[in-house]
């Protein structure tokens, strides 16, 4: 029986290693799942809880499993999402806009959520990407510890490098729980960030048209 348990643990650890994020500092070894669960127990004790009481006995394992999902963006790169493009764009010469892409991310300062919507547009030159891929790209970066500014920049850069379009426009609107549920306690405040490249950056009229389409379609 002990041999079976040992084998199961080894398999579990192997599976955990397979999930190792690809974007980690090379000098930062990843703690084991058991070590991560122990850290959760420490935090439970720190806030004044008894991590051994019945209702919390499975909490460390649940928290770490949820982290595998919430922070799953570390295990992917933009190339995994934008690996397939299409060249059949015909005579289309305007920009493609996806608006109101919902997302939830976590603030890197307090590890509490911020959530909102991303609006993404690009001017294709020779190739386009599937619409779902843009939403997946937003999720990829949102499922990491973030600042809203960095999230905006990462989405913009990834599309710019993968598609080589005439321009990219990204706007994000979000509410940050670090303002709503702690600190200044101001729920309902919306933070807006934007970044433009190419035609969107160089031609203010295109920026106006981008924003007009966002507001006009609500």
Swiss-Prot record:
The keyword Iron does not apply. It catalyses: GTP + H2O = 7,8-dihydroneopterin 3'-triphosphate + formate + H(+). Pathway: Cofactor biosynthesis; 7,8-dihydroneopterin triphosphate biosynthesis; 7,8-dihydroneopterin triphosphate from GTP: step 1/1. Keywords: GTP-binding, Hydrolase, Metal-binding, Nucleotide-binding, One-carbon metabolism, Zinc. Gene3D superfamilies: 1.10.286.10, 3.30.1130.10. One of its GO terms (biological process) is one-carbon metabolic process. It holds the Pfam family GTP_cyclohydroI. Signal peptide: none annotated. Zn(2+) binds at residues 107, 110, 178. GO terms for molecular function: GTP binding; GTP cyclohydrolase I activity; zinc ion binding. It comes from the Bacteria. SUPFAM superfamilies: Tetrahydrobiopterin biosynthesis enzymes-like. Its EC number is 3.5.4.16. InterPro entries: GTP-CH-I_C/QueF, GTP-CH-I_N, GTP_CycHdrlase_I, GTP_CycHdrlase_I_CS, GTP_CycHdrlase_I_dom. GO terms for cellular component: cytoplasm. Belongs to the GTP cyclohydrolase I family. Homomer. HAMAP family: FolE (MF_00223). This is GTP cyclohydrolase 1. It comes from Azorhizobium caulinodans (strain ATCC 43989 / DSM 5975 / JCM 20966 / LMG 6465 / NBRC 14845 / NCIMB 13405 / ORS 571). The lineage of its organism: Bacteria, Pseudomonadati, Pseudomonadota, Alphaproteobacteria, Hyphomicrobiales.
